């Protein structure tokens, strides 16, 4: 029970935090990742490799419990996605290729590196990274099973399969897309509820004003976030096929490109046009 208090109750709002790192590169991070349960690492001396593994198992198990409590068992697909995304982010945090920075993220990264350097009597950074990657490959199945062990009745057999390794930026773009579509739908349903009696060009008045402005602000902020994420993707993928992943994402949403992604639907214009 005490281990749950080492990590806070999950915030339920969908949010992305965009910040500039030390290299002057802006990174947008899902709030889910910012809340990843890594505090137990910092609350332990991690004297031995066995203790490190014990704390890692506790952390993934606690993360799953907190995500389940956040979801309240309402949507298995959302719970599944968050489980799998958090597991992948545990890997990135451990391996050292996490795009998130600051706070516990940097402290945990440095602490784990120090401990693994002690465990293996190795100071060379490249060799140390290879050691961590080998350790992950050896232990990932056990970590994943420990993460889902109490929730196998709440997820599908497909969801229970250990997540395949995929670049963090790809996973975050997919997660952003899922978050975007959910929030867009919620805000648009509010417009339809509040503005159904609205007459053309009068949306800026009465109860229709706030839903329309909230939707507009959300779309503007979301476009900035997606531009940041796609720029990060292109920086990390310089090959000939660098746009394939993004193009597939646009096609999945029946869009042609980034600009098309954020065009207002005709129904929005009909309900919220207040020129």
Language-model features, listed with the residues they occupy:
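Intrinsically disordered, low-complexity segments
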Residues: 1-275
